[in-house]
C-alpha cells in the first residue's frame, strides 16, 4: 500500500491509500499541486480512504465500512466532499466558476447540463479558470476560494468544441476515462461573486431571466455539492447567499453565455 496526502481548501488534508500504482499516479497528477506522497508517520490521525484493487475494481475502506466500486476517482472526490461537509467555514457548490474583471461568475447545474463544455469554451475564450465540478465558498465573506483541479471532459463535450473550431490542449486519461484539460489562464486568488447563473441547455432558445429571492433560495437548495443539514444556520446562510445577483440562464449557443457574462 502507498499513501498520498491531498491538501484541502481549509488547510487540512486527507490520506488516500492504495495498492494500485496507476491509481496513485493518476491521483498525484489530477490533484497537483495539492497532492504528494506521504511518509509513514504523516497519515496518522488523518481522515483516510483505502482503495484496494481487487477483481477488476476496488474494495473501499472508510472507517469500519467497506464497499466495492468500479469508480475509484468518484469515491475519492465524494470522500473529500464528505470530509469538508462538517467544516462550517466552507460551502461547496456543484458548478463551474470563472473570473471576469476581478469578480467570480458561477455556473450552477446538475450533471449533464453541459457546464463542463461551457466552462472549457469560456476558458478558450480567455476567461480565467477557477473551478469546475466543485466550487468552494468562504461562508463568512462569500468569497470564491481557488483550489485548482484540471477540467475533466467527456468525448462529446470535446466534439462540440471542435465543431466550433476550438482545439483545447488535452490528453486522454485511461483511468479517468476523460480528456484532461489544463486551462492556460487560471485565477489563483479569492474573489467576490459577481453573478450566479442557474443554467439549462435548450435546443431552440437563448434567454437570461431574473429570479425572485424565493426562487433563488429554492434553486440554491439543490445546488450544493453535498447534502447539508437542513437547520436554521444553513437556511440563514442560503438567504444571505441569495442576495447575490442570480439569473436563470437558458442557452442554445455558447457565445450567448459569453455575451451575458460580459454585460
Region roles according to the model:
Residues 29-33:
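N-terminal "assembly arms/tails" that initiate or stabilize quaternary assembly
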Residues 39-82, 254, 262-263:
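Charged, amphipathic alpha-helical linker segments immediately N-terminal to NTP-binding catalytic cores
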Residues 83-86, 182-184:
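Short, P/G- and charge-enriched loop/turn segments at secondary-structure junctions
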Residues 85-100:
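Pre-Walker A adenine-sensing motif
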Residues 115:
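Conserved lysine of the Walker
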Residues 118-119:
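Post-Walker A alpha-helix
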